[in-house]
Amino acid sequence: MTLNLCVLTPNRIIWDSEVKEIILPTNSGQIGVLPNHAPIATAVDIGILRIRLDDQWVTMALMGGFARIGNNEITILVNDAERGSDIDLQEAQGTLEIAEANLNKAEGKRQVIEANLALRRARTRVEAVNTIS
């Protein structure tokens, strides 16, 4: 038995096919979803979506959004997403270094919050590349 997974951003469809299992980053922690999962709607956190195909795991960097699960259908609507295999590791590490520097020189509450978000996004992109199996 399989699940139909659809990952969407406001501009494009990132993924639309059948999968065996996913591990989804939510605001309350990661959840694993297998066929016949109980219906839920949940907020999606910045983090790594892990997708199991037959004998292979694929990663995707998600930048926050919402997910609806029910009747073996998973719809994930996110602000942005990238497949781990599409991310350039050197570019992602460069962005991470810039984000860390920006956090260190951030002044004021708003700049610190924005710098922390940018750092989380950058770390997620690097992690998506590094966890490809």
Swiss-Prot record:
Location relative to the cell: Plastid, Chloroplast thylakoid membrane
Gene Ontology MF terms: ATP binding; proton-transporting ATP synthase activity, rotational mechanism
Membrane topology: Peripheral membrane protein
Pfam family, one: ATP-synt_DE_N
Gene3D superfamilies: 6.10.140.480, F0F1 ATP synthase delta/epsilon subunit, N-terminal
Protein role: Produces ATP from ADP in the presence of a proton gradient across the membrane.
Family affiliation: Belongs to the ATPase epsilon chain family.
Name of the protein described by the UniProt record: ATP synthase epsilon chain, chloroplastic
Source organism of the structure: Piper cenocladum
